[in-house]
A protein has these predicted regions:
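Membrane-interface motif at the C-terminal end of an N-terminal transmembrane signal
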Residues: 17-43
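Short beta-strand elements
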Residues: 162-181
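Short, solvent-exposed, Trp/other aromatic-anchored flexible loops in extracytoplasmic proteins
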Residues: 119-162
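Extended, solvent-exposed segments with strong compositional bias
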Residues: 95-137
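N-terminal Sec-pathway targeting helices
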Residues: 1-19
Length: 181
């Protein structure tokens, strides 16, 4: 085989690989949000009340959350699909264990970002007390896309240290948007 044939075969191989890479890249980008279509154009039920999370809090507002007087377990969600959501959870720590958030799309009851959400919002309760205490977590919601709002039920859960049985403590409905990958 002559040198010119070897060069031609080498250049042809590089061109074919480059074209294959471009097609693969196009396919990946086109299918990036595949599956998120079920979160587009969801009708928000009119018979339920929903809050839309405030996008952010000032440092002073965040500091003031510790002074809120609470008489029941409570969840407040702050943020958006772009930068993620902050979860402020109030709970009276009468038992050692783990406190965390679960989220469900409300009309189809689909659990959202199951592993990430429970892991990133998990707070270990080691000190017990008679007063409600503020716990904080942060996570993205991966399902959906920016500016396509859909109804979500956020639930506060507790799992005792010496048991695998989870207990749902409270829930709150919001309309949120997801994170574009």
């Amino acid at each position: 085989m002559t040198l010119s044939k070897k060069i031609f075969i080498g250049i042809s191989t590089i061109i074919i690989l480059f074209i294959g890479f471009v097609f693969w890249l196009f396919f990946e980008i086109a299918n990036e949000n595949k599956g998120d279509e079920i979160f587009y154009n969801i009708k928000i039920p009119e018979n339920l009340n929903f809050d839309k999370p405030i996008e952010s809090l000032t440092y002073q507002q965040i500091d003031s959350l510790t002074n809120i007087e609470v008489n029941d377990d409570k969840i407040v969600v702050i943020g958006d699909g772009y930068s993620g959501y902050d979860f402020y959870m109030w709970h009276k720590p009468t038992e050692k264990g783990e406190l965390y958030i679960k989220a469900f799309e409300l009309t189809q009851n689909i659990q959202l970002s199951e592993l990430e959400l429970s892991t990133r919002t998990e707070n270990e309760i080691t000190e017990l007390g008679e007063n409600y205490k503020l716990y904080i977590g942060n996570s993205l919601i991966y399902e959906g896309t920016f500016a396509n709002y859909y109804p979500v039920r956020f639930e506060l859960w507790f799992k005792p240290k010496n048991s695998e049985i989870e207990k749902k403590l409270t829930e709150k409905n919001y309309v949120i948007d997801g994170w574009d990958r």
